[in-house]
Every structure is written in C-alpha cells, then in structure tokens.
C-alpha cells in the first residue's frame, strides 16, 4: 500500500489542523477557530448559522434540505496546557515531527474537525 502523505486532500487536512492548533482556544475562548472553518465551508456552499449559548459561540453549517440529515459535531476549545516547559514542542505551534502532528487539540479535537471540514 502506497503512502498517501502527498495527496492534496491530506495536505489540506494537515494544513487546516495546524492552523486550528495554532489558535490558542483555551476554554471558553474560540480564538476564531470557527471563523476559519466557517470561511472554508461557506466557499463550499454551506449556509452558516452562528448561535451564542451563554458565553460560547456555536456554528451550524448546513447544505441542502433533503433527507436524510447527517451531522458532524465537535468543539474548538482546549483545556489549559499546564506547564508549557514540560511539552516536547510548544503546545500551539502545530509542529510535525516524524510524521506526527503535535499540539494542543491535535487528537481532541482540532485534527478531527479539520478532517470533517475537508471531507
């Protein structure tokens, strides 16, 4: 099986994940993560609705009205980093080392959000 690391879609996912990781969106801050995703989704024809619940922005991206409905759900905020000196790489740099993306939110949940948006 060949490597897919150089496919345009892979590059888009990684680039968006890095851009999201580089935004310091510590709870409850969004740091414009949703704006970044909404801009991409709007260019793809999605209708973006923003809703505030207390102090938290939530975005709904819809495309079409036909059934069945399908939903991706996630969050852009991350927990505090703790002592950043204990990190192998700065938590908000989005460093790729040995093919692994490092940073706060890479696994929960900014990497997954990037994959959802690009898909």
Which ranges hold each PLM region?
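Acidic/His- and Gly-rich active-site-bordering loop/insert found
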Residues: 2-106
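Active-site alpha-helical elements of protease catalytic centers
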Residues: 105-119
